Amino acid sequence: SLMEVYLPPFYAATKAGTGSMMTAFNDIAGVPSTANEYLIDDVLRAEWGFDGMIVSDWNAVAELINHGVAETEEQAGKLALQAGVDMDMTSMVLPTKIKAAVQSDACLAHDLDAAVARILTTKERLGLFDTPMAYHDPEREKTTLLKDEFRRAARHAAVKSMVLLKNEKQTLPLSSSPQTIAVIGGLAEDKLTQLGSWRAQGKTDDVVSLLEGLQRNAPSGTTVTYAAGTHPSSEVRGAIQQAVDTAMDADQVLLVIGEDFDLSGEARSRSDIALPPSQSELAQAIFATGKPVTVILVTGRPLALED
């Protein structure tokens, strides 16, 4: 599964010319990614030919202690460097502890030299030796962020990544003939969730929600109605009946359910992979209408849809 399912996207990224990779927090077969020499040196570098820089995830070098594979920060830094990690993101283990590690193990100097060489090579490729402030031009933000080319690429990636789980009754594609389409579910207009749980500098003002996109692009003569019903993070159920009424007045129902940005993400995912109770109750009420329903699942991880 590792080679056939999980690694192919990363292999494709290396062949597309990516300049750096980041190790994950998790372990593979008991070995933390940040100390995984097999993944970094054997697979990524030797087998795939990647010659870029490897950076750890946030504080991941220090957290090798939490994984139980290192007792001290010096040991953690040594493990990461030997595995092929070049740059330590924020934990400051490599900058502060690696000198002592090299003094106690001279063989580590070779790994250190290789890491430094890869970092300097990356800087050279970026032109930072000639123009150190090249990426600090305030005008660059205005001309680069969200440019049309990047939006098109993001849209293309989103379209390619969508999965149609089943279409047994041939509900899709929806007819372009005049009709009423009811969009049900608070996630349909949740722009924060569209940005995701780790959205960096993303702004909701730049997001086109699912509901907005449908309203803007609906065929002539098609009416798009909306009812939130419930939201994944809300315990309020009072609006479910309004959603049912809206669905009953429609020809087709698009039911948008799942988890919002606060229920699925780094260090915040629920322990249960079933739908949040409010979402399950909304779905059952809408299915009971007997209307043709298309479920649009919004989630940052796999969910069990047993109901």
Stretches with model-predicted labels:
Residues 1-307:
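Glycoside hydrolase catalytic-domain context in secreted enzymes
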